[in-house]
Design a protein with these regions (language model features):
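Acidic catalytic loop of the alpha/beta-hydrolase fold
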Residues: 182-187, 214
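Short beta-strand/loop motif that positions the catalytic acidic residue
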Residues: 172, 178-180, 184
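Gly/Ala-rich beta-loop-alpha elbow adjacent to hydrolase catalytic centers
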Residues: 133-141
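Alpha/beta-hydrolase fold nucleophile elbow
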Residues: 124-134
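Short, surface-exposed "cap/lid" segments of acyl-processing enzymes
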Residues: 48-90
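Catalytic histidine neighborhood in serine/cysteine hydrolases
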Residues: 198-214
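Alpha/beta-hydrolase active-site loop
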Residues: 103-123
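N-terminal cap/lid segment of alpha/beta-hydrolase-fold proteins
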Residues: 19-51
Length: 240
């Protein structure tokens, strides 16, 4: 199980590449039928006329601390996926933005994430799903994605291991990418490295040096880590 705590195999040129990606998608604002009412969502569909190798859901950080689907880290993750020609669905958890309901401490939010998968899957029949999430959203997304057979790959961004039980991952054999700031306030580097090293299956951890939980000033490296991992797994992907 490879554990990369740096950009092993990537040139310095790639690390410094300007990731100002152009937008090549149709954007749809919609509401999903959630368990406690409607869930506000945005679906980006690539304008390329080809079947994508993946379709993705990206979950946002903790809503009680200002997290929404418009969070900068979530937006950058979605933008990176979009640049690769991957359809992306972002949504607001219950009680966030225009979504109905109240925050449920990560329990009901798992049902919300499942609704997002249920909506996305029939939009792209037969296409495997990728579940990604940032911070609180990474825990929700990983929990749901590990259980759901439609999800074949997982991405955890800013994994908050300091205060969260992540033992559920010990039973998850699906390929996983973790992108983490070396100075993350909510996930000590050493602990994240230990957690990922002990996981079954194919896992990669990319530590972004000098970055905090929100990857301030380091979003180019953040974007490059996601793009590189997906291109390795899916050589047919190419950045627009």
């Amino acid at each position: 199980m490879p554990l990369n705590s740096a950009f092993a195999g990537l040139s310095g040129t790639l690390l410094l590449t300007n990731f100002a990606m152009q937008i090549h998608h149709d954007s749809q604002s919609l509401f999903l039928n959630g368990p406690v009412g409607r869930l506000e969502a945005i679906l980006w569909i690539p304008t390329r006329h080809e079947v994508p190798p993946l379709a993705a859901v990206v979950c946002h950080p903790h809503p009680l601390f200002g997290g929404t689907m418009h969070n900068k880290v979530v937006y950058n993750a979605a933008k990176t996926l979009d640049a690769l020609g991957i359809p992306v669905l972002r949504f607001n958890f219950r009680g966030t933005g225009l979504s109905a309901g109240e925050h449920d401490k990560g329990r009901g939010e798992q049902d919300d994430a499942l609704v997002a998968l249920d909506y996305l899957a029939p939009q792209f029949p037969g296409v495997p799903l990728l579940m990604a999430g940032f911070s609180f959203g990474s825990i929700v997304g990983l929990r749901v994605g590990c259980r759901d057979a439609r999800v074949t790959e997982l991405i955890g961004l800013g994994f908050p291991v300091n205060s969260t039980d992540v033992s559920f991952l010990r039973e998850c054999h699906k390929p996983k990418l973790f992108v983490h700031g070396a100075e993350d306030q909510f996930g000590a580097r050493k602990k994240v490295e230990e957690v990922v090293a002990a996981l079954p299956g194919e896992n990669r951890l990319v530590i972004v040096e000098h970055a905090d939980h929100f990857f301030v000033g380091h979003l180019d490296e953040f974007n490059a880590a996601i793009s590189s991992w997906l291109k390795e797994r899916h050589p047919e992907l190419h950045t627009v």
